[in-house]
Each structure stands twice: as C-alpha cells, then as structure tokens.
A protein has these predicted regions:
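A short, Lys/Arg-rich alpha-helix, primarily the initiator
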Residues: 1-14
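Short alpha-helical DNA-recognition segment
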Residues: 15-34
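DNA major-groove recognition helix of helix-turn-helix/homeodomain DNA-binding modules
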Residues: 43-61
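Residue register of alpha-helical TPR repeats
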Residues: 67, 105, 130, 149, ...
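Structural motif corresponding to the intra-repeat A-B loop/turn of tetratricopeptide repeats
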Residues: 79, 161, 201, 221, ...
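Amphipathic alpha-helical segments of tetratricopeptide repeats
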Residues: 90-95, 139-140, 172-183, 212-222, ...
Length: 372
C-alpha cells in the first residue's frame, strides 16, 4: 500500500468524510478508492489537491527536505551514532512532514514504541525491520535487513535474557560487518556486550580479551563513559570469582562513585573485613540517586549488604531471607540477567543454610554457566 494513499484514507475517516465529499471536483470516487487502497498512483496534481483539502501540506520542497532528513537519520542509526540521531530529530517537528512518504522513516527513527500494525502494509523492508526491533522481534529484523545494526540489536536482546551462546554469535557478526564498513560505534558496542556475555559466564580471559579491544576503541574516541563502564564490569566480575582485594582497589579509588559502585565497594569491604568502611560506603550511597537501575531496587540491594554487616548470623534470620528473595525476584523481572547472576551466590548460600536443597538445585539448573 502507498503511504500517501493510506494517510488520505486515515485523515478522511478522522474527519468523518465520505469519499465523494473528499474527491468532489478533484477526481472520481473510484479513482480515490484505488488511491486509498494502493491500487493506483495519483498524479502530482490530484495528490496535492486531495492533501490540501485534508489540510495536509506537501510539496516537492517539503518532500525533499523530509527525504534528506530521513536518509541522514538512517545513516546515524546504522552507524550507531544514536546521540547524533537524537540531536538531528529532536529539533524537528516530524508532524510537519506527515503527508510525505518519509514521515514513516522519521517516526520510526524517533519512536520508542512500534507504530500501529495497520501501517505495516505501507512499510518498505528497512522500515519494517525497524518496526520489528521496536516490537522486540530482532530475529525477524535480521532476516529483513541483515546488517551490523540489526545483528547488534539481536545480540543485545539475547544477552539480556541470558542466551549467551546465540548472543555471542550475533554480536561477533555485528562486529565483523561493522569493521568492514568502518562503523566504529557499532564495533565498540558489539565488543562491550561480547565482554559482558563472557563476564556473566565468569570466563574472565575472554571478557578481558574483548574489553581490551573496547579500551583501544574508547580511547580513540575519547569515550570516558565506556572506559568507566568496562572498569566497573571487570571489577564486578572479580567480586564474582572471589578476587575481592583487586576489586576493592578499583572501586575504592573512584573519585566520583555512583550509587551502584558504592554498593560494590561495600561488598568488597564486607568480604575483606573492612566493616566500618563498608558502612561508610552504604551511608553515602543511600543519599544518592540511582542512574543505573530503579532507585527503590538499588536501596533494597544496599539494605541486603547492611543487614549482613549488622547481623553476622543473618542466615538465621527469616527477615533477611525474605528481603533477599524479593530483591532477587525483582532483579530477574526488571533487569538483564547479569544482575541476578551477580547475586546468585547469596541465594544459594541462603537455600543451603535453610536446607532448601531442591530450590538450590533448581537455581543452579536455571543458571548452568555460573561457577561457584
């Protein structure tokens, strides 16, 4: 279906007009019907008159402007330059281009949610691939438009649900395709999530191998945020495998720690016998906002660490078990699997202490890649 035929149809219905009322003096009813159903391409003059009657503005200048804007947007998207894409579109009134075919591109590029399914018949392959990504159907997006960006989105989606093998395959493909085309930001993001995927499986050598590439790329791009991110993830992985002193050195030297980095510092201090320093970190964290995760969940995670510090016999307290289980369930529901994996040792510790061996085994089966 032709998009402009679709928009004429939708706008006519929105005004509760008949076909005869809209096309009077412009064209025949049968011709309008064919235009609306995509069976006929209207002449420029007929299209202009129909749109004008519907109070929709479209001329060659507007259409060219919209097309150029959309193509620049697609280039930014497929290059992974999302900040530049946002800057490009946020200053534009996309509804100004509503009567142009490029409105679909601009709306998809700026949307956080999928468009109405009824409009999919008007979409080309590229647009439909973006629609599928917004719908959470990344596999279908890859089938429609197999490029570095769609493979990256597929890899990230698989990573978030803990499907690490398929995630690694998609992310490696994304990196390879991006490297051929010089899409550095896609290369960077693919390597970040490759490192994350191996880190969540406690495969530290492979995590560090991918993060080393990330480090080189990020330094070249002067991307301090990414350099912090891989440092944070590396130190968090050290906690998971018991390298508490190394993790402590990294978290304790941060000049501007976040709430979650203070949470990790408190755990390092807990594990290395620095109780007072752990409490200081918790006190500071509790006064901060959480940018990384939901604030109420972050406070619950801090409460868990404080409980263990306040009560050395915490494994005999039902209150601790209830708080732990609530936090773990929220982590599984609300966040990528890595957050739950990080807290898995405390869950298993609780189940074993309370002789809930069946639940401990079920949890181990749910996270088979976790080494304890």
């Amino acid at each position: 279906m032709n998009y402009q035929g679709y928009i004429i149809y939708r706008e006519r219905l929105g005004k509760n007009w008949s076909q005869a009322g809209l096309c009077k003096g412009i064209c025949t009813v049968s011709y309008l019907s064919k235009i609306e159903t995509g069976k006929a391409e209207p002449s420029e003059e007929v299209l202009r008159l129909l749109l004008a009657r519907l109070e929709l503005k479209c001329d060659k200048e507007i259409e060219q402007e919209a097309t150029e804007l959309a193509e620049q947007g697609w280039e930014f998207l497929f290059d992974g330059r999302l900040d530049q894409l946002n800057d490009l579109l946020k200053a534009k009134d996309i509804e100004h281009y509503r009567a142009t075919p490029a409105w679909l591109d601009l709306t998809l590029l700026s949307s956080k949610a999928p468009l109405d399914k009824a409009i999919e018949a008007c979409m080309d392959t590229r647009q439909l691939a973006m629609q599928r990504i917004l719908q959470g159907q990344e596999n279908e997006a890859v089938r429609l438009t197999p490029n570095a960006y769609t493979y990256l989105k597929l890899g990230i989606a698989e990573y978030k649900v803990g499907h690490y093998s398929s995630s690694v395959d998609a992310l490696q493909t994304a990196y390879d395709l991006a490297s051929r085309e010089g899409r550095i930001k896609i290369m960077l993001d693919a390597k970040i999530f490759l490192g994350n995927a191996y880190g969540n499986q406690q495969d530290i050598p492979n995590m560090e191998r991918h993060y080393q590439v990330v480090k080189r790329l990020a330094e070249g791009l002067q991307d301090q945020r990414t350099l912090y991110f891989i440092g944070y993830n590396t130190a968090s992985s050290w906690i998971e495998i018991g390298r508490y002193e190394e993790a402590y050195k990294w978290f304790s030297k941060l000049e501007k720690p976040t709430l979650m980095s203070l949470h990790k510092l408190a755990i390092c201090c807990e594990k290395t016998g620095r109780r007072e320093e752990a409490l200081t970190a918790l006190n500071r964290a509790e006064t901060m906002d959480a940018d990384e995760i939901n604030h109420s969940l972050a406070l619950q995670l801090l409460s868990l660490v404080r409980y263990r510090l306040d009560y050395p016999d915490y494994l005999t307290h039902d209150e601790y078990g209830s708080l732990l289980l609530e936090c773990f369930n929220r982590l599984q529901r609300e966040l990528p699997s890595g957050y739950a994996i990080f807290h898995l040792p405390w869950m298993l510790e609780w189940y074993k202490a309370t002789r809930q061996y069946k639940k401990a085994c079920e949890l181990m089966e749910e996270f088979p890649g976790k080494t304890l």
